[in-house]
């Protein structure tokens, strides 16, 4: 009997037209892939001792990574040097508190991070080829500002189609992902047992939940939710979907449509992924004014507060920015220099102010205390100095890669 489109989404079965991928393990062994992965890994970490050591012995370290991957294969497969195979180390989590939430962060060893970057280099074109266009959060050039621009377009150009919105997120998303289910989903399109074995090995010890802090985790999490994006946009016919990792916003013309969609979303998450929506999901009319009455509510999403004709910054971000500005002003009055992390944080906050309708707030709460132009000059000077210091090292890395290519 032929299965319906909805049944295919509820069960982990391949959909028509989806490409299958083989020989990914062989790609991991390519010299240029290993070197490119290391180049990405070392960004922003050049002062770490492990990175400096690898820089000084790059060719040897590349060969070690090659040997490690070559000898990491499933049980029963002959390898030349089994003692060189990748063996996951015991990980001790670091507890952090972020936005009022307690999170466990796992910090892998440097060679393990390198392996993760190699895996992502191979996986990235596979995942991005079929990823939903407005899925944000971990894809390059698809951050909060990318998502914000699209929401503003929808609100401005389609008032009828954005009368109502549903906002929801998945309960304990990272901690609730089951490794067996994740590996089954990967196996739908990836027909390379050796490649899948290495991914499974990286996540060994996490039968339920994938670790925050692993570079591969965010990519695998996005891959897992691709079928959910297709269910909402294609099967349920709701194209105005914005997903920021596990935070989901859907616009529609009526609440009934959104309520029915939530039923299907919960069904799919439960049956296919063994995941649950949080119970505090919202289905609301979008904010509008009728005479002197204010009806509905604004959308609070990705750090922004969206109205029909304006976008503001979330209150806690604005308060953090103003407190930092005053703190830097006190340092200046005491004839103390600025910390680099404070300068970079302040310039980062300026990104929120420049892309939202908060100029009055900037004028009254930020501008009297700091000079943004001077901060930019300080950071520019620091980066120029770092570039000069790292120029010889960069030549060495490029030269080593070129020599390997010639060989």
Model-identified regions with their sequence ranges:
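Reverse-transcriptase-like RNA-dependent polymerase core
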Residues: 33, 67-101, 114, 191-205
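Active-site-proximal segment of RNA-dependent polymerases
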Residues: 8-14, 22-24, 116, 120-178
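Short beta-strand
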Residues: 86, 239-244, 277-279
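Residues immediately flanking
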Residues: 121, 168-170, 253, 304, ...
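Conserved pre-motif C helix in the palm subdomain of viral-like polymerases
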Residues: 101-131, 207-234
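Right-hand nucleic-acid polymerase module
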Residues: 1-9, 108, 113, 117, ...
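Conserved polymerase palm-domain catalytic core
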Residues: 149-245, 249-270, 284, 298
């Amino acid at each position: 009997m032929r299965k319906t489109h909805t049944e295919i989404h509820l069960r982990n079965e391949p959909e028509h037209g989806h490409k299958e991928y083989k020989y990914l393990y062989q790609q991991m062994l390519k010299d240029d892939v290993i070197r490119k992965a290391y180049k990405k890994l070392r960004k922003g970490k050049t002062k770490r001792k492990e990175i400096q050591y690898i820089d000084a012995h790059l060719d040897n370290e590349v060969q070690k990574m090659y040997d490690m991957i070559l000898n990491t294969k499933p049980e029963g497969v002959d390898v030349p040097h089994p003692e060189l195979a990748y063996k996951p180390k015991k990980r001790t989590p670091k507890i952090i508190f972020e936005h009022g939430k307690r999170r466990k962060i796992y910090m892998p060893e440097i060679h393990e991070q390198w392996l993760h970057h190699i895996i992502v280099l191979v996986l990235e074109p596979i995942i991005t080829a079929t990823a939903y266009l407005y899925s944000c959060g971990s894809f390059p050039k698809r951050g909060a500002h990318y998502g914000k621009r699209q929401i503003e377009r929808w609100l401005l150009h389609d008032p009828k189609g954005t009368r109502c919105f549903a906002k929801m997120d998945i309960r304990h998303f990272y901690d609730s992902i089951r490794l067996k289910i994740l590996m089954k989903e990967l196996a739908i399109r990836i027909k390379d047992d050796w490649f899948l074995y290495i991914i499974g090995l990286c996540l060994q010890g996490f039968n339920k939940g994938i670790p925050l802090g692993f570079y591969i985790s965010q990519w695998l999490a996005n891959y897992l939710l691709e079928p959910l994006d297709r269910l909402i946009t294609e099967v349920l016919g709701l194209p105005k979907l914005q997903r920021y990792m596990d935070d989901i916003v859907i616009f529609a013309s009526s609440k009934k449509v959104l309520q029915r969609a939530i039923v299907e979303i919960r069904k799919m998450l439960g049956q296919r992924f063994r995941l649950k929506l949080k119970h505090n999901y919202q289905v609301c009319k979008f904010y509008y004014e009728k005479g002197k009455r204010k009806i509905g509510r604004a959308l609070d999403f990705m750090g922004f507060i969206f109205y029909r004709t304006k976008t503001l910054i979330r209150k806690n971000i604005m308060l953090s920015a103003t407190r930092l500005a005053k703190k830097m002003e006190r340092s200046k009055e005491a004839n103390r220099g600025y910390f680099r992390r404070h300068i970079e944080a302040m310039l980062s906050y300026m990104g929120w102010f420049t892309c939202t309708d908060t100029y009055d707030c900037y004028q009254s709460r930020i501008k009297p205390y700091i000079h943004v132009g001077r901060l930019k000059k300080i950071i520019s000077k620091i980066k120029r100095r770092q570039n000069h210091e790292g120029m010889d090292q960069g030549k060495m890395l490029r030269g080593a890669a070129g020599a390997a290519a010639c060989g």
